[in-house]
């Protein structure tokens, strides 16, 4: 995952306390980092939703640079809306937690 600064230390502390686990090989994330080695199987996959969908992304996200976001929008703009959050990197809730809540609330209500 891309490295980014975070001013919300309470959020970082929560992640540190609940998202890592100690193993016989040391400390590790609780998710399976091997999943990133096979993401190419999703390229060209056409997701279908039977409900409204919203893609929230940070304007400064390294993973949304280049043609990545353009390609995602081309492929899915017919079935989902896109919301860019200014001054946020890849992990949008870390940078702008209240803005993410507002975006979701405005979408739902």
What residue spans do the PLM features occupy?
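C-terminal alpha-helix
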Residues: 103-108
